[in-house]
Every structure is written in structure tokens, then in C-alpha cells.
Swiss-Prot record:
Residues 76-161 form the RCK C-terminal domain. This is Uncharacterized protein YrvC. It comes from Bacillus subtilis (strain 168). The gene is yrvC. GO terms for biological process: potassium ion transport. GO terms for cellular component: plasma membrane. It comes from the Bacteria. Gene3D superfamilies: Regulator of K+ conductance, C-terminal domain.
Length: 165
């Protein structure tokens, strides 16, 4: 994630972030504790499409939630212990990732990474449950994958992120 900070004289500080998936978010932190969060159009980073304002307490609570400190569902704890080392992960295929335009079979996810592709949510939100080995992965597809941590991390690093290219 790219992060750029700048001072806003008389107002506070501005933080701009561009995520791995090329989403742009700006946060303005006012001297009085208010925070304004802006989300920009994915095709035009100058066009704000949504915004929200938080007071200081709301911003701190949101930070704890995003950081995973505020809430962990009890059911999730039970599932984690029942499944032991099995992890289910949602991962978006980044622009420039080696997996783009490859089939699941081409990637050899089962043999090479010991991972199963449970589903794919296409960029247009079309859902493919239990996709076949002939299913092609496109930029922006979200893969729901399961396996053990090492194989999952390796697959994500080597095939689903632009760094793997």
C-alpha cells in the first residue's frame, strides 16, 4: 500500500492511500479530532464517490475494528479450533499478477500449493462456486481459497499479487 501524508495548515493532516488493488482513500484528520474519509472512483482517482465523517471517539472505535482488536466472533474461535490448521482466505487477483488469464489448472494450485479454490467472485459480482480447473482467473477476481497457512501464503505471494510477476 502506498501512503502519502501532508500537512493542511490550519486544518490538520491529510493521508492518502492507494491499496494493492488500486483503490484510493483519503483521510483528513482535523485539529479538533474529526476525521473525514473519502473513497475515490477506481477509474478516476480525482472523483470522490463516497465520504463519511467520524468524531474522535468514532474514529478510534473504527480503528480498533479495522485492526481486529475490537471483535472476534465466538463462532470463529470454535471454527478455528475445529479446523485446526485449515484456513479459508479471500484474495483478489491483482493487476499484473501471474495468475491473470491463467486457468486454475494451469496454476496447479492443488499439487503445487495444497490449496483448493472454493469459489470465485468475478469483478462483475458473478459468483462461481466450486470452479473447474478450466476456469480462467481475471484481474479483479476474488478467489475464496482454503488450505494450510504456508501454501496459502505462497500461492497469494507467487501468483495472486503483482509482486509475483
Amino acid at each position: 500500500m502506498r501512503v502519502r501524508e501532508s500537512e493542511l495548515p490550519g486544518i490538520g493532516q491529510k493521508v492518502e492511500m492507494i491499496t494493492r488493488n488500486r483503490d484510493k482513500i483519503s483521510i483528513i484528520i482535523h485539529h479538533d479530532g474529526r476525521r473525514e474519509l473519502y473513497y475515490f472512483d477506481e477509474n478516476d482517482h480525482e472523483e470522490c464517490v463516497a465520504s463519511v465523517q467520524f468524531d474522535d471517539a468514532e474514529a478510534r472505535q473504527m480503528s480498533a475494528i479495522l485492526g481486529g482488536m475490537a471483535y472476534k466472533p465466538k463462532a470463529l474461535e470454535q471454527v478455528e479450533s475445529a479446523l485446526d490448521d485449515l484456513i479459508i482466505e479471500w484474495c483478489k487477483a491483482e493487476a499484473g499478477a501471474p495468475a491473470i488469464h491463467q486457468t486454475i489448472g494451469d496454476l496447479n494450485v492443488g499439487q503445487e500449493y495444497h490449496v483448493t479454490v472454493i469459489a470465485i467472485v468475478k469483478k462483475n459480482q458473478d459468483k462461481q462456486l466450486n470452479p473447474s480447473s478450466e476456469t480462467v482467473i481475471d484481474e479483479g477476481d476474488t478467489l475464496v481459497i482454503s488450505g494450510e497457512g504456508t501454501g496459502l501464503k505462497r500461492l497469494i505471494r507467487e501468483k495472486l499479487t503483482a509482486k509475483g510477476a
